[in-house]
Amino acid sequence: MSVATPRDPRFRVNGTDVVSAVQPTQSQPFVVFAPGLYAFDHKSTYLVAAPVSVPVTDPGSVTPVRVEAEPNALFVKEVRKELHAYYVKCATQTVLLPTSCPFGKTFSNRVISTPAWAMVSDPPITIVPDPNSAHWLVPFATGQAHLVVKVQSLFDGSITTFDSHVPFEVSYTIEVATDDHLTITSVYR
């Protein structure tokens, strides 16, 4: 039997937990008894795969099996929670370009007050398989932060208050470790 487990090496066969020893983009061979009926599935904290029953009738044959884990509701909820906390923390930075954050604003004039950020709307979160890796992807989406700062014109010295929403676009890759730890990495255009 040749078992492919893209994006998560864990699966169950006939109720027994197994962890594939190969890269998630490869299939791992397993020796099984024939004839037999083998039920494959996956259930972890953040992922679930529908059961797949595979009959093996010919000794010595190679039967391909693909266990396709999908994000469950808890996965989306946890990623949304972690990213919201990240955005809120970014908004506490009193600079125009918050460090390691997806939003920021530049001015060609002089900034004369401390920038004040607030989150208006988080980007919507959907989680799909990353076509370029064995991880998960939050596709590019737009959120909005709000910035208030006083700006002085370099041309005539007039002072105005910039008090507007600042849209930002971001994507994320997500790796789910075998201990269910999430590693979320920002992707920018």
Named regions from a protein language model:
Residues 1-189:
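Short loop/turn and low-complexity linker motifs enriched in small/turn-promoting residues
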